[in-house]
């Protein structure tokens, strides 16, 4: 019996001695173990199939094409730590005002429970887009809804922004995500918008930050799984390394910037197991 191989039978004689009874018992145990092993294999196969289906569904829920405007080019990428994850992003267009909006979010926990919470939150946001809320109003409304409807053991960090393509104005509210980065004229600065994670307190308040952008600016939103990725010595990637990616990416389009971020993160961890979902949005003002 090697590596869980129970597919054998012990030969039993026709005598009634104790040894033959023991061998009959061994055969019974082996047959039971064989059935149990096959049952476990079938269960594992069904779980893998369900996770693969959930992963395909989650991929379809993500925007297949990002909105394009005259002055803003956006790219995004999400890499879950497991088959499904709690990070997600989305983009919208406000029909009446003409503003663009978007979000990046990170649900506490990992795997299927986080993915279900993410799907709930994404659906709530989608149902409120027609109201054309500003970022502060969106976070306030979303927080109240999640506080009422979501499980107590989960919460979510999220940044929501609107983009005025005519006036090059970005407005952003942040509920617990790392501070977004702005590259401008050879320097990187943090956008100091703060707020508590969503779903923790019913009456949490959020602030909005308005940025007058300029052509040539690059904006970077990201979840903490990016900067908290560690190398073999347990040193995290960190915001400074992420800022250095932006500094070295001057002249590249948004899609290439996103790829550069993941390339540098992977170089840092040197193929160590990814323990958290990672999501990046890069936007270039043109």
Predicted segments — roles?
Residues 20, 24-27, 31, 126, ...:
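A specific heptad-register position in long alpha-helical coiled-coils used by two-component signaling proteins
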Residues 39-220, 270-286:
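… and, occasionally, acidic/histidine-rich disordered N-termini of signaling adaptors
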């Amino acid at each position: 019996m090697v590596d869980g191989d129970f597919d054998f039978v012990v030969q039993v004689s026709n005598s009634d001695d104790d040894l033959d009874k023991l061998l009959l018992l061994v055969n019974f145990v082996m047959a039971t173990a064989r059935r149990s092993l096959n049952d476990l294999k079938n269960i594992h196969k069904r779980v893998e199939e369900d996770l693969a289906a959930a992963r395909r569904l989650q991929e379809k829920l993500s925007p297949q094409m990002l909105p394009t405007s005259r002055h803003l080019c956006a790219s995004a990428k999400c890499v879950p730590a497991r088959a499904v994850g709690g990070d997600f992003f989305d983009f919208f267009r406000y029909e009446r005002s003409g503003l663009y909006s978007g979000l990046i979010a990170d649900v506490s926990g990992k795997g299927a429970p986080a993915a279900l919470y993410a799907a709930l939150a994404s659906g709530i946001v989608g149902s409120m887009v027609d109201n054309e809320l500003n970022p502060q109003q969106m976070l306030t409304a979303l927080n109240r809804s999640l506080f009422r409807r979501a499980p107590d053991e989960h919460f979510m960090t999220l940044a929501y922004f609107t983009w005025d393509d005519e006036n090059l104005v970005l407005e952003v509210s942040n509920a617990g995500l790392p501070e977004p980065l702005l590259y401008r004229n050879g320097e990187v600065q943090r956008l100091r918008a703060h707020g508590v994670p969503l779903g923790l307190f019913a009456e949490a308040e959020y602030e909005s930050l308005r940025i007058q952008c300029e052509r040539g600016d690059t904006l970077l939103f990201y979840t903490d799984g990016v900067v908290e990725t560690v190398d073999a010595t347990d040193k995290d990637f960190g915001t400074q390394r992420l800022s250095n990616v932006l500094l070295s990416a001057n002249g590249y389009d948004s899609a290439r910037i996103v790829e550069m971020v993941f390339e540098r993160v992977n170089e840092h961890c040197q193929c160590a197991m990814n323990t958290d979902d990672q999501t990046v949005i890069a936007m270039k003002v043109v």
